[in-house]
A protein has these predicted regions:
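Active-site neighborhoods and metal-handling regions in enzymes and metal-associated proteins
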Residues: 1-168
Length: 168
């Protein structure tokens, strides 16, 4: 069932998503080689709480084994939803950070991929094509289109035009 949101609800959703964006912007300022993803997660956790948000991933799951982190951080070939850890980031790493925040009872959630230092030409190309694919999908996120239309646009650009794979 689809629940239509009113203007006030949409504004609250926007504010939550904006705090996710601000958190990712804060992370962008500090990322560097030698830093651990566990440290980055702690920065994320504190920033969210300092801005009256609640990290929505933290504590998620069964009571016996809740997710312990404020974010999911994937480095290089870790596909998605990696756990922050004590491994140090290196020059050329690509780091995807996924953050969810509850603000005023509304969730905001998105991810961003960062390069640590100067990545290889191959990695730069992957990042470029991935970003282009995102925008191809966004172009198809219009009234009367389906999720499949968005997915097809992304897959077409990523796989058929550039030879990369899409995780399913």
């Amino acid at each position: 069932m689809i629940y239509i949101k009113n203007d006030e609800q949409i504004e609250l959703m926007r504010k939550s998503a904006l705090l996710v964006s601000r958190t990712l912007a804060e992370v962008a300022k500090i990322l560097k080689p030698g830093m651990t993803t566990l440290y980055v997660d702690n920065v994320i956790d504190e920033f969210i709480k300092d801005h009256q948000g609640i990290p929505s991933f933290k504590g998620y799951g069964p009571v016996s084994n809740p997710y312990p982190f404020a974010s999911c951080i994937s480095v290089n070939d870790v596909v998605v939803h990696g756990f922050p850890n004590k491994k140090e980031l290196k020059e050329g790493d690509i780091v995807s950070i996924d953050i969810g925040i509850i603000l005023n009872k509304w969730h905001g959630d998105h991810a961003y991929t960062f390069a640590i230092g100067e990545p290889s030409k191959e990695v730069q190309q992957l990042i470029k094509i991935t970003k282009e694919s995102l925008y191809k999908g966004i172009e198809k996120a219009v009234e009367n289109n389906r999720i499949g239309d968005i997915a097809f646009a992304i897959q077409e650009h990523t796989e058929k035009k550039h030879g990369y794979g899409v995780v399913r």
